[in-house]
Structure formats: structure tokens, C-alpha cells
Curated annotation (Swiss-Prot):
Keywords: Host-virus interaction, Secreted, Signal, Viral immunoevasion. The gene is C. Residues 258-277, 295-305 have a biased composition (Basic residues). Belongs to the avihepadnavirus precore antigen family. Its main location: secreted. This is External core antigen.
């Protein structure tokens, strides 16, 4: 990092701008360190670890914007903050909420300063090509104290007498781009952790796997709509919603004594239960002959006698 002396010359303000831009690098490396060391330090299930790695491959428009993401994350974290929870996902999501808020403001400030410098850059100055600007992957390998020096050497190699205001503009644009890529990585991690609090880590893991499968399937072989986490986490409720429920309660089998089957027989064309006591036959039944009196048991005298 260069120690520039502030001079009253016409480009003194520009030198002050370069010095200020080097101070902003202290906030640049925070998400880089967090996102690099994050995967190796955090213990998690192997399936969850794979799903988290797949989060980085999801389309950019899948995730909410920074403002919406931070607001949704705060709503999900508020109950845990009130109870002073120390769950893994709560601690990490809280860290990324604070990090993204501060880091996003720093990045927006870099863009605003860079745009304001356009008015004082000579109109004939050619912009620094992208190949001369440090990229995000290179910034991860360069020490913090050497980042500004490496970028300045590249600008000088492009044009030794490059205007000072244009150099400041190139520095800010390079750092802002690195910031945005780091913010995107932190944004995906924040989305993962606060959704694990809302839906459960296993459900989010399952959702990411199904979504990745849907995205990798050719359009003509997959469904029209992408899978949603609501449908995955509530399959039972959805299936039972269309079933008609009976008004009464059904007793489970086996809790009431078995009813004994009653055997029946047919007597004179009528059904009678054997379990009932047999009653004496009535004097006269339908379809039966008249009962004989006791005297009828003796034979009547023969008329021949």
C-alpha cells in the first residue's frame, strides 16, 4: 500500500482519492475470507454440503435482490434473536446479514465516486481494458497489502502516463466488481442459512437437489413449472386436502369384543335363533293340524261293535 503525501497541487484531491480507495480495501477481504474458509470450517452432513455447493451454480435471478434478501432474512431471524438462540444457522446468518449490509453500502459508495470522476477525466482518455483489471479469482491469491500495488502496476503497463483521475476511476471500478462478486457469494450463503431455519436443513437440501435436476433436464423432457419448496415440504397436507372426512369417529379394530354370530334354523317356515330359549309350541300354528285332545289318544270304539 502506498503512503501518498497530500499536496496542494491541482491533482491533490485525486491523490487523496487514491489514498482513500486503498483504505477501503480493509472491508474488501472480509467476505473473501469468510466464504473461502467457510466450507472447510463448518461441519455439516455430506448431503447438505453437496447441496450447499450446488447453491453457487443456481442462476443469479433465482435469488432475491440484496435489499429484499436482507429484509426476508431479518424476518426469519427475529424470533431467534428474541430468544437469544445460538443455533448454527442463526449465528452464521446473523453474521452474513451484518456483513452484506455494510459491504453493500461500501460497494455503492465506490460506484458513486467512480461515476462522479467521469466529469474530470480527459475525454480523450481510453478506458483501461478488462484484462488489465484484477479479477476476483486473482484477488483471492494476492495479499491485502499488495492488491493496490498490483493494480497500479497493471495500469502503468497499459499506459505509463495514464491520467491520475482515470487511474482512480479504474481502481474503484476494479474493486467494486470484486466486491459485487463477493457479495453474490455471501448472498447465496445467507439465503441457504435462513431458509434452513424456515424449512429445515433436510428439506432445503432435498429442494436444491430437485431444482438442480429440473434445471439440468432438457425442456421438452421436464415439467413446465420448477419444483417449489412449499410443495416438497407439505406433500401430506396437500394429499389429504381432497379426501372427504366422515362426520363420526371410527373405532379401531381389535378394541371391542368380537360379536358372536348367531346361528339360525328354519322351523315351520320361520327363522328362530338357537340362542334363545325354546318355548313350548303354541296350541295352533299356521299350516299345522289341530292339536288332539287327551282323549283322542284312546282309539274310538269300532262301529262294528
Amino acid at each position: 500500500m502506498w503512503n501518498l503525501r497530500i499536496t496542494p497541487l491541482s491533482f491533490g484531491a485525486a491523490c487523496q482519492g487514491i489514498f482513500t480507495s486503498t483504505l477501503l480495501l480493509s472491508s474488501l477481504t472480509v467476505p473473501l475470507v469468510c466464504t473461502i474458509v467457510y466450507d472447510s470450517c463448518l461441519y455439516m452432513d455430506i448431503n447438505a454440503s453437496r447441496a450447499l455447493a450446488n447453491v453457487y451454480d443456481l442462476p443469479d435471478d433465482f435469488f432475491p435482490k440484496i435489499d429484499d434478501l436482507v429484509r426476508d432474512a431479518k424476518d426469519a431471524l427475529e424470533p431467534y434473536w428474541k430468544s437469544d438462540s445460538i443455533k448454527k444457522h442463526v449465528l452464521i446468518a446473523t453474521h452474513f446479514v451484518d456483513l452484506i449490509e455494510d459491504f453493500w453500502q461500501t460497494t455503492q459508495g465506490m460506484h458513486e465516486i467512480a461515476e462522479s470522476l467521469r466529469a474530470v477525466i480527459p475525454p480523450t482518455t481510453a478506458p483501461v481494458p478488462t484484462g488489465y483489471l484484477i479479477q476476483h479469482e486473482e484477488a483471492e491469491e494476492i495479499p491485502l497489502g499488495d492488491l493496490f500495488k498490483h493494480q497500479e502496476e497493471r495500469i502503468v503497463s497499459f499506459q505509463p502516463d495514464y491520467p491520475i483521475t482515470a487511474r482512480i476511476h479504474a481502481h474503484l471500478k476494479a474493486y467494486a466488481k470484486i466486491n459485487e462478486e463477493s457479495l453474490d457469494r455471501a448472498r447465496r450463503l445467507l439465503w441457504w442459512h435462513y431458509n434452513c431455519l424456515l424449512w429445515g436443513e433436510a428439506n432445503v437440501t432435498n429442494y436444491i437437489s430437485r431444482l438442480r435436476t429440473w434445471l439440468s433436464t432438457p425442456e421438452k423432457y421436464r415439467g413446465r413449472d420448477a419444483p417449489t419448496i412449499e410443495a416438497i415440504t407439505r406433500p401430506i397436507q396437500v394429499a389429504q386436502g381432497g379426501r372427504k372426512t366422515s362426520s363420526g369417529t371410527r373405532k379401531p379394530r381389535g378394541l371391542e369384543p368380537r360379536r358372536r354370530k348367531v346361528k339360525t334354523t328354519v322351523v315351520y317356515g320361520r327363522r328362530r335363533s338357537k340362542s334363545r330359549e325354546r318355548r313350548a309350541p303354541s296350541p295352533q300354528r299356521a299350516g299345522s293340524p289341530l292339536p288332539r285332545s287327551s282323549s283322542s289318544h284312546h282309539r274310538s270304539p269300532s262301529p262294528r261293535k
